[in-house]
Amino acid sequence: MANSIVSLAGDQVLAVAQADATKVYRDLSTYRIQLALEEDGWHVDYELKDPRLKGGGPHYIIDAQTVAIISKRYEQ
C-alpha cells in the first residue's frame, strides 16, 4: 500500500512539474526526467538526453505533502 501511495504522489508531482516546464520549454521530448523523493521533498530534474548538446532543463523541488513547487531553476 505504501508503494502505491508513493507512486500516486510521484505521478502527481510529475504532472505539476510537467505543467510548469511545458510553459517555459514547450517541447520536453529532448529531456530525460529523473524523479527522486528526498528529505526536503520530491526532486524532479530534466536532463538533456544527448550529452553533446549544451544547456539543460528545469529542476524542481516539490513539497511531498502539498505537491506545491518549493523551488525551481531553469537552465537554457
Regions found by a protein language model. Name each.
Residues 1, 75-76:
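Short, solvent-exposed mixed-charge patches
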Residues 1-32:
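Short, non-transmembrane alpha-helical segments in secretory-pathway proteins
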Residues 29-69, 73-75:
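Exposed beta-strand-loop-beta-strand "reactive/processing" segments of non-cytosolic proteins
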